[in-house]
Amino acid sequence: MAQGAMRFCSEGDCAISPPRCPRRWLPEGPVPQSPPASMYGSTGSLLRRVAGPGPRGRELGRVTAPCTPLRGPPSPRVAPSPWAPSSPTGQPPPGAQSSVVIFRFVEKASVRPLNGLPAPGGLSRSWDLGGVSPPRPTPALGPGSNRKLRLEASTSDPLPARGGSALPGSRNLVHGPPAPPQVGADGLYSSLPNGLGGPPERLATLFGGPADTGFLNQGDTWSSPREVSSHAQRIARAKWEFFYGSLDPPSSGAKPPEQAPPSPPGVGSRQGSGVAVGRAAKYSETDLDTVPLRCYRETDIDEVLAEREEADSAIESQPSSEGPPGTAYPPAPRPGPLPGPHPSLGSGNEDEDDDEAGGEEDVDDEVFEASEGARPGSRMPLKSPVPFLPGTSPSADGPDSFSCVFEAILESHRAKGTSYTSLASLEALASPGPTQSPFFTFELPPQPPAPRPDPPAPAPLAPLEPDSGTSSAADGPWTQRGEEEEAEARAKLAPGREPPSPCHSEDSLGLGAAPLGSEPPLSQLVSDSDSELDSTERLALGSTDTLSNGQKADLEAAQRLAKRLYRLDGFRKADVARHLGKNNDFSKLVAGEYLKFFVFTGMTLDQALRVFLKELALMGETQERERVLAHFSQRYFQCNPEALSSEDGAHTLTCALMLLNTDLHGHNIGKRMTCGDFIGNLEGLNDGGDFPRELLKALYSSIKNEKLQWAIDEEELRRSLSELADPNPKVIKRISGGSGSGSSPFLDLTPEPGAAVYKHGALVRKVHADPDCRKTPRGKRGWKSFHGILKGMILYLQKEEYKPGKALSETELKNAISIHHALATRASDYSKRPHVFYLRTADWRVFLFQAPSLEQMQSWITRINVVAAMFSAPPFPAAVSSQKKFSRPLLPSAATRLSQEEQVRTHEAKLKAMASELREHRAAQLGKKGRGKEAEEQRQKEAYLEFEKSRYSTYAALLRVKLKAGSEELDAVEAALAQAGSTEDGLPPSHSSPSLQPKPSSQPRAQRHSSEPRPGAGSGRRKP
């Protein structure tokens, strides 16, 4: 973007220099006094003066733009200021120069010319900061003088901050009576980022009274001559024409411009040139690029120039009006060049002589128009540093035409990635209260004024540091055409919707909550392709949006889905009830279409219910199942309208049959429901009457004789069984370990994929004791023949012979026994059957197994114990409790990760620990006579310690033999044990369980000869 330096002449003209051109001083122009070091780095403002009504009742406002001073080497032509203080702070520091304004989106501003002196009705920067310089009143201005622009300095102005003095550029003084000020009392107090400003009460003191006769001759102004580029001038001119209209000369009917009379030459005037009073221009060197622009955005000037004509047509058509709405005033004409020599801003030293000849050209290059006179006492709080544009004004109803056009232009650039700020957010400035603070901030509006889709709102601006200044209620003209265009824009909006105004109202400034717009509902955001997607396809893809939302009923889609559910096309039986049990219109349609595939004509209610339940798995929550049964009852009543009196009666009777089935065939403990109870529970439920008694008796008998069975998902059952039997399953499932097993996870069986088969053969099993050595009921103790398979740490019992790779049935899996921490011993005390051995598991269940031969019995015992010794993981320590009741610790079912050598050492350590604990327990029981429950618990603990000692002893002995054999084959272990010739170490005889041990007799039984008669037999006959 082209940038150039803009310098303002004393007549209000401007000249544009090329970007970053070297600066040099005019030979005639004095060099301004440099500001103190404390002023550098501060932020200044380009402001527009706020004043009261002008000659025609027009009011003006004031706006600031943040800027930062640039510094350069001092010019050798520094002249001491006649009013400079003697303090060191008043001396010009090195590196200061005149101020140049870099133009970038600066509005039509009233640039106040100050040469270190307070303007009429205002204060200089140094006085705002607490300076002590005496005020200098200025002479009266001509009638047309207040049309020129002024540049008022900010904290960045090259003025002394403490004890500030006037610039040395004004060396000619004019003596005469003071003229009344033309601006408001508080219209020009300085704009400070920290919110400081001179109070209006000090103005009278600062300006002095009528007796003051010292005035400044502002004829000799200083400037910073930079090379003027015609391209930069065209850009500046185009910017002004884009924002504020054409620069064509006023019409022939306009009043000719008035010129102020020249002031008499004052003291110290150079070459006797007289300059108009108040015409000394003070420049502020500012570069907006060096300041964090809080409320400004950039755009491409080339793109803006392309759309200039459209904006010009919208702006120039508005009559300039700052009075009441509906009153228009023609634009004030621009004055011609004032008499008297003045330094040219467009040339260097060589162009000084052509100053007066180029006056008319300077007028043509004028960018800013003059400002009107101001009314004193119009102090208003500053809303924001957002510039006020001519042609715009706050409105309580909406934006004006310029705002609409400008927002339309910015909207087109928003799509190109450029962010803008609305310039019409001025509504809250209309009528501030007299008691309000002079400073406040607001956030810029994120929404455009047109009824098009709202763009994403930018992040709210941080609270800005308040710049001192004022603004009037009617800063820009408000025309009737703007109201008409706004009315047309509102008429195009939908009924009942307010247009999103780009201006901030009081509510948007924190005084109230006002929604700026509403987003469309989420349902409208669904694309047409999604809405047209077939419901069946949604369900096939696993989508439940149609079912969950449920208010869009599609009969054709429901028919297609019902057909697929009935034929199980892409669905399982478990999915049918889920689709029929939803509480929405679409699911009701699907259920109605699904039940049409069933014909219940001529069937009793229980028969129809059995047929229906065979086709689907009645699953889900209670309310979902009740909805499915309601659909069934409706269909049954349609097929058999004569069987029952109403549809509600059919539904009531259907639910009663389901409850009766649960009561008669469930696992509940208690009294079963009788036929009389069933009939009595249904009294008065048939639409206020009773059901036929014979019907209820028939239904009760049918349910009692044959329970209702609904379909089970056979696919799920087959998959679970196949995964359990698969040698390489993807998912390992845990199955319950045997009949009567506890719910502990340590007792569950985990099929081991790829486990080795150590032995298989025929076995006959008898359950001798349930977990915790509880006696097995008599009806479950019988002997049953199986084919045993020792695979890993699980002993599988099958009905048929072992076949590698054969899948196991559910019954065979339930009969499986885990041998972790188990011990197999010869049942020497059992004499009813030969070749019987005991198998005691980790949960203290006891099984009796009968082998075909003695060798097979010995082989089963050896291999079961060796496998348990190799893979049983070390147990956890026993639980610690304050209770005296003994409880066995749980033993882990997972395989150990220790090597066989480490496993042997672990078993030997546990053997020593169990032996030591058993000795301590027996020593503690000496001399005590336990009674009742306490004695029984002590006996259980002693039996447990004895069993654990025997088990670890067997494990350690067998692993030592296996390691000595040096082979992983169990046949080698059996051969080594056979060569030892003793089974006492590896297979000691034991009883089935401690609770089943025969109690030893307190007195030894005396042996008697067979010929001796029994005691107490008397003379009875003896058997021969």
Swiss-Prot record:
From the UniProt entry, list the residue stretches annotated as the region Disordered. Answer: 25-98, 113-230, 246-401, 430-536, 976-1024
Query: What is its subcellular localisation?
Result: Cell membrane; Cell projection, Ruffle membrane; Cleavage furrow
Q: Offer one Pfam family short name for this entry.
A: Sec7
List UniProt keywords, sorted A-Z: Cell membrane, Cell projection, Coiled coil, Guanine-nucleotide releasing factor, Membrane, Phosphoprotein
Q: Start and end of every PH domain? A: 756-869
Q: In which tissues is it expressed?
A: Isoform 2 is expressed in the brain.
Spell out the Low complexity composition-biased ranges.
987-1004
Cellular component, GO annotation: cleavage furrow; dendritic spine; postsynaptic density, intracellular component; ruffle membrane
Where would one find coiled-coil regions in this protein?
898-924
Annotated positions of the Phosphoserine modification: S126, S156, S720
**Xref: CDD domains:** PH_EFA6, Sec7
Compositionally biased residues, Acidic residues: 300-313, 349-369
Taxonomically, which superkingdom?
A: Eukaryota
Molecular function in Gene Ontology: guanyl-nucleotide exchange factor activity; phospholipid binding
Give the UniProt family note: Belongs to the PSD family.
Quaternary structure (record) = Interacts with ACTN1. Interacts (ARF6-bound form) with KCNK1; does not interact with KCNK1 in the absence of ARF6.
What this chain does, per the record? Guanine nucleotide exchange factor for ARF6. Induces cytoskeletal remodeling.
Its recorded name reads: PH and SEC7 domain-containing protein 1
Q: Which gene encodes it?
A: PSD
